From Swiss-Prot:
The gene is glyS. Keywords: Aminoacyl-tRNA synthetase, ATP-binding, Cytoplasm, Ligase, Nucleotide-binding, Protein biosynthesis. Catalyzes the attachment of glycine to tRNA(Gly). ATP binds at residues 195-197, 205-210, 322-323, 441-444. Substrate binds at R97, E163, F210, T211, Q212, A213, E214, E437, P438, S439, F440, G441. It comes from Pyrococcus furiosus (strain ATCC 43587 / DSM 3638 / JCM 8422 / Vc1). GO terms for molecular function: ATP binding; glycine-tRNA ligase activity; protein dimerization activity. This is Glycine--tRNA ligase.
Length: 568
């Protein structure tokens, strides 16, 4: 019988304290998972690796609320566009995600199709309810954000955040001041996000509450060469670009430098952070041959993205699973928040030398329009002052073409306006920064780290070959038998290792063979065994989880040796 890694891992996670479905005693709730003692430890280690990598890049961390006022998500586009297609059974009332139902029934990809198009496909192929066989409704869109209210008033609508990013964008003015108005700079946040998935399945792969680590890198769109790209240019990336997906050409492997030169990746700024993502996943313990970058098709991309590459990890059960997104969000978010809030979210870019530029200057001809516009003059003047150079150029073009324009509801002719082209010396310009966003999920890499670590030896031993510094229990101290003086010596070693900062357990129950199996199964890289030789010469054995080989070490050298073995 073939070993079912998924089923074994699900059992292992529940049985040994890694993770399990939430609210078990009340029948559970799909899309929610609890982390047990071992799982929570690994999850924290993943977060620590990501946090340390971000800090090494010079990014700084903030923390913002999970509950966010509705205005923020109106501005960000989530109220309008953060939706999935939904369909309901007219007979039993069961609801399903329409695109998934069509794909599972017909094997066709309907990503990007409208609700009307999906309804037509359902009707043409007579797709029925998977639960009861009943007729399905027309497809409509369901917003994935959890809705709530701030305080006792229904007019203070809010949402649980679907991403941590907006908390960074709305704080841009303060963050830019903290960064001393100097681009580029990065800000990250690690925290919970919430998406009210229609039908979450696949265990920990699709959750309604999950943890993200997102960094927003603010940069000048005219400066897209990363200053440290030379340090990473030779790193090999496995890519699956759009062209290769459409033509079924498979993946390609090439260096970061080649990826930019051949046009697969837009610039060295983008490529640099692809390498950063890959290195973080390797540091967590994901095997290199299980990592690839897939470029999202245009219809897959989020409403804010101009280009997105997903770092995917391979799963025996689920295939390639998206775990990290690298999205070019352009100036979408900051521009939207500027418009909605009225706040100035620009950055002043100072030139090395002053520039002479030609500018359009459009004002009202007061002699001509003053008598007829009267109190409206101020309003129209303010509108003209607020217009960008591009808007003024369009206004003049329209005036030349039609002989008139409408401003603030008032029709104005050529003679009503004074149009001049003036030269101006400028020291710099205000820009809305663009954003590149590496966005890590934590829960999916957690599960896929366990799946890719689960190993079966030739003799049938099942153990977790997790990267040693990612193990939830780093050391087990075991007396060979539960007798003095072995137990006292073992316990003293255990206490000393605790003080040295190891995650360590003491265990004297069952035979030594059973205990080795117990700790192999949860990935403990080393067992320190106090045996009958220990009282005679002050040495113990350190057993390696993967090879099962043992070395003898003096008790006083155990902490140093374990640090060397586990952390390098």
């Amino acid at each position: 019988m073939k070993f079912d890694k998924y089923e074994y891992l699900q059992d292992l996670m529940r049985r040994r304290g890694f993770a399990w479905g939430s609210f078990e005693i009340y029948g559970g709730a799909r899309g929610f998972y609890d982390y047990g003692p071992l799982g929570a430890t690994i999850k924290r280690k993943i977060e620590k690796k990501i946090r340390e990598a971000f800090i090494r890049e010079g990014f700084f961390e903030i923390e913002t609320p999970d509950i966010t006022p509705e205005q923020v998500f109106i501005a960000s586009g989530h109220v309008e566009k953060f939706v999935d297609p939904l369909v309901e059974c007219k007979k039993c009332g069961a609801r399903f995600r329409a695109d998934h139902l069509i794909e599972e029934t017909l094997g066709i990809d309907v990503e990007g199709k409208s609700a009307e198009e999906m309804t037509k496909i359902i009707r043409e192929h007579n797709i029925r309810c998977p639960e009861c066989g009943g007729e399905l409704s027309d497809v409509w869109y369901f917003n994935l954000m959890f809705e709530t209210y701030i305080g006792p008033y229904k007019d203070k609508k809010a949402y649980l955040r679907p991403e941590t990013a907006q908390g960074i964008f709305v704080n841009f003015k303060r963050l830019n001041a903290f960064a001393r108005n100097k681009l580029p700079f990065g800000v990250f946040q690690i925290g919970k996000a919430y998406r009210n998935e229609i039908s979450p399945r696949q265990g920990m792969i699709r959750l309604r509450e999950f943890t993200q680590a997102e960094v927003e890198i603010f940069f000048n769109p005219n400066e897209t060469e990363h200053p440290h790209f030379d340090e990473v240019k030779d790193e090999v990336l496995r890519l699956y670009p759009i062209e290769h997906q459409l033509k079924d050409l498979g993946m390609i492997e090439l260096t970061a430098e080649e990826a930019v030169k051949k046009g697969y990746v837009m610039n060295t700024f983008f490529a640099y952070y692809m390498v950063m993502i890959k290195r973080i996943l390797l540091d967590i313990g994901i095997p290199e041959d299980k990592i690839r970058f897939r470029q999202q098709l245009p219809e897959e991309r989020a409403h804010y993205s101009a280009d997105t590459w997903d770092a995917e990890i391979y799963s025996e059960r689920f295939g390639w699973v998206e775990c990290v997104g690298l999205a070019y969000r352009t100036d979408y978010d900051l521009s939207r928040h500027m418009k909605m809030s009225g706040a100035d979210l620009t950055v002043m870019i100072h030139y090395d030398k002053p520039k002479i530029v030609k500018k359009l200057n459009v004002t009202l001809n007061m002699k001509k329009v003053g008598p007829k516009l009267k109190e409206k003059v101020k309003e129209i003047n303010e509108k003209l002052k607020s217009m960008s150079q591009e808007e003024l150029r369009k206004l003049v073009e329209e005036l030349n073409a039609n002989g008139k324009v409408i401003i603030e509801g008032h029709e104005l002719e050529k003679e009503d306006l004074i149009i001049k082209e003036v030269e101006e010396k400028i020291q710099g310009e205000k820009i809305v920064p663009h954003v590149l966003e590496p966005s890590f999920g934590i829960d999916r890499p957690f599960y896929l780290l366990l799946e890719n670590s689960l190993t079966v030896d030739e003799d049938g031993r099942v153990y977790l070959k997790i990267k040693k510094d990612m193990a939830p229990i780093e050391v087990a101290v075991l007396p060979l038998v539960a007798k003095e003086p072995l137990t006292t010596i073992a316990y003293e070693i255990y206490r000393n290792l605790q003080k040295e900062g190891f995650i360590v357990v003491y265990d004297e129950k069952d035979s030594i063979g059973k205990r080795y199996m117990r700790y192999d199964e949860i990935g403990t890289p080393y067992c320190v065994t106090v045996d009958n030789q220990t009282p005679e010469d002050g040495t113990v054995t350190i057993r390696d989880r993967d090879t099962r080989e043992q070395i003898r070490v003096k008790i006083e050298e155990v902490p140093r040796k374990l640090k060397e073995l586990i952390f390098g």
